[in-house]
UniProtKB/Swiss-Prot annotation:
Subcellular location field: Plastid, Chloroplast thylakoid membrane
Membrane topology, record value: Single-pass membrane protein
Organism per entry: Welwitschia mirabilis
Gene symbol of the encoding locus: psbN
The protein, known as: Protein PsbN
PANTHER family in the cross-refs: PROTEIN PSBN
Family recorded in the similarity comment: Belongs to the PsbN family.
């Protein structure tokens, strides 16, 4: 394979992995530990 193809595939895999981890952190099991500042604020 050419170098440009390998670099493109590597960057694409990193981007997909980072996006998947961000979605898992936002909506998955770790999201239970996140606090909601709007719920903490009293009107």
């Amino acid at each position: 394979m050419e170098t440009a193809t390998l670099v493109t595939i590597s960057i694409s895999c990193l981007l997909v992995s980072f996006t998947g981890y961000a979605i898992y952190t936002s909506f998955g099991r770790p999201s239970e530990q996140l606090r909601d500042p709007f719920e903490d604020h009293e009107d």
